[in-house]
């Protein structure tokens, strides 16, 4: 491996709030893929960390799913804050200071399997900034109660303990600890972490724009507004697309830390030839959630099936809108040609029997499923939304204006009725997907992390 392709010597972790296959869509695929990239670039046993409060039993099942699916090499690479608190909490026994609950604040007690109180968490109902409040978190240890400065203090104390573990194992008390933060709420909570041995790198997974997500000058509010105010605090910020990086830099400024490294996919075996597929089968693969606007595809379908009577639309994925979408299918009278299949573990097999991949999404950070479909040789019909479809599709598909049902219908009809055009687009698909292969993306990610490591911490005082 060339020096430029290898990470600087340090310990590396990726950190999210919750990372769960089947619950967190493409995010739960992209994060462990980044973990693998780190290891391939020379990181020593990088970890995937989470801070959600599900039970240890739920976390154990989620970890096993990552291992069984080939996403993470072994369960020991995944750790959770609350699992470790419930197993004793002694790693935080030296954190914080003696004390108790903050007066006037409601608390929730977390207990272990034996009923012993382990930690007391402040509760802030309907407060979007709960993670930034300073009310004490109380950790019960064998040496007595310790208080930490809110959830920020809790997260930092846990990460400090892991960093110290790794330093002790390496025999180097000054070893750098690099946290690749995958969740904005967590990133916000870490900007006061001023240890000069820590580097904080933040990745982006979605559009920062408010609905309807197509105006780069629209007022940015809520979580995104708060997060953008913290841009200067990160040692590197990794955007999934050039378009989003450029629009954010133009509007909010680039502190000299912006990089682009898309989420990766595995290319897999060579796809089936276009002629061997069901020529009139269209497939969608996404969460059944408002962002994905599957309703637009369903509304476009009556015109498609009128023009191509044997056309079939297979929709794979689950989510809160499943019943609503099924009702729409029934209302439009297309239940014979539109099927909501639910989640599938046979993604490639589904792609290999289809002729066209369709997404009618309202916005994206990158659109990982587009790259996955391209890797299987599928032409893509996508709404031309910010961000990702335009950069991914290239000359391997058709982009249509967001929200235009007639344009969706016309694009699908045009491809389903033109075998030659489908074959032409399919021939370009694999090359388009190659831009998202690990070997293509790794140099950009390494460059971002190298820049962070080779400069002093932006938070050190």
Report the location of each language-model feature.
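C-terminal alpha-helical cap of glycosyltransferases
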Residues: 438-461
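Membrane-proximal helix-turn-helix segments that form the acceptor-binding/catalytic region
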Residues: 163-167, 207, 216-237
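A conserved mid-protein helix/loop that constitutes part of the nucleotide-sugar donor-binding site
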Residues: 280, 284-303, 308, 313-315, ...
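Conserved acidic donor-binding segment of nucleotide-sugar-dependent glycosyltransferases
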Residues: 394, 398-406, 414-420, 434
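Short hydrophobic beta-strand element within catalytic cores of glycosyltransferases
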Residues: 379-383
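Carbohydrate-associated surface elements
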Residues: 243, 264
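Aromatic "clamp/platform" in nucleotide-sugar-dependent glycosyltransferases that forms part
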Residues: 343, 362
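A short, well-ordered alpha-helix in the C-terminal region of glycosyltransferases
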Residues: 350, 414, 421-435, 444-447
């Amino acid at each position: 491996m060339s020096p430029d392709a290898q990470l600087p010597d340090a310990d590396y972790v990726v950190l999210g709030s919750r990372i769960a296959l089947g619950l967190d869509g493409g995010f739960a695929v992209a994060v462990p893929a980044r973990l693998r990239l780190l290891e391939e670039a020379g990181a020593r046993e990088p970890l995937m960390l989470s801070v959600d409060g599900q039970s240890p039993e739920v976390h154990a099942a989620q970890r096993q799913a990552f291992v069984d699916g080939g996403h993470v090499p072994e369960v020991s690479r995944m750790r959770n804050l609350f699992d470790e608190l419930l197993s004793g909490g002694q790693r935080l026994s030296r954190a914080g200071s003696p004390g108790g609950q903050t007066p006037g604040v409601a608390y929730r007690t977390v207990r272990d399997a034996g009923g012993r109180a382990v930690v007391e968490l402040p509760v802030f109902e309907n407060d979007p900034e709960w993670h930034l409040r300073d009310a004490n978190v109380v950790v019960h240890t064998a040496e007595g109660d310790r208080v930490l400065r809110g959830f920020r203090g809790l997260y930092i104390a846990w990460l400090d303990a892991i960093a110290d573990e790794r330093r002790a194992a390496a025999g180097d008390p000054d070893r750098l600890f690099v946290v690749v933060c995958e969740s904005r709420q967590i990133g916000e909570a870490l900007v006061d972490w001023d240890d000069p041995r820590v580097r904080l790198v933040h990745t982006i997974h979605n559009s920062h724009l408010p609905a309807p997500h197509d105006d780069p000058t629209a007022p940015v509010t809520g979580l995104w507004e708060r997060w953008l105010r913290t841009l200067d605090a990160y040692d590197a910020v990794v955007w999934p697309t050039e378009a989003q990086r450029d629009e954010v830099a133009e509007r909010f400024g680039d502190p000299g830390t912006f990089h682009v490294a898309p989420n990766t996919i595995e290319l897999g075996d060579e796809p089936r030839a276009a002629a061997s597929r069901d020529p009139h089968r269209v497939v969608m693969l996404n969460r059944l959630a408002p962002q994905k606007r599957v309703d637009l595809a369903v509304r476009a379908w009556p015109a498609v099936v009128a023009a191509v009577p044997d056309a079939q639309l297979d929709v794979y994925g689950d989510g809160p809108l499943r019943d609503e979408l099924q009702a729409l299918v029934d209302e439009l009278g297309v239940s014979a040609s539109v099927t909501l299949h639910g989640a599938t573990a046979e993604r490639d097999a589904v792609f290999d029997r289809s002729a066209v991949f369709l997404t009618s999404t309202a916005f994206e950070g990158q659109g990982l499923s587009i790259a996955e479909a391209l890797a299987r040789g599928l032409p893509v019909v996508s709404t031309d939304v910010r961000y990702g479809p335009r950069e991914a599709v290239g000359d391997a598909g058709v982009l249509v204006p967001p929200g235009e049902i007639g344009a969706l219908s016309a694009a699908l009809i045009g491809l389903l009725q033109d075998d030659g055009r489908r074959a032409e687009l399919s021939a370009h698909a694999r090359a388009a997907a190659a831009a998202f292969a690990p070997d293509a993306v790794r140099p950009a990610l390494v460059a971002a992390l190298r820049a962070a490591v080779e400069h002093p911490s932006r938070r050190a005082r």
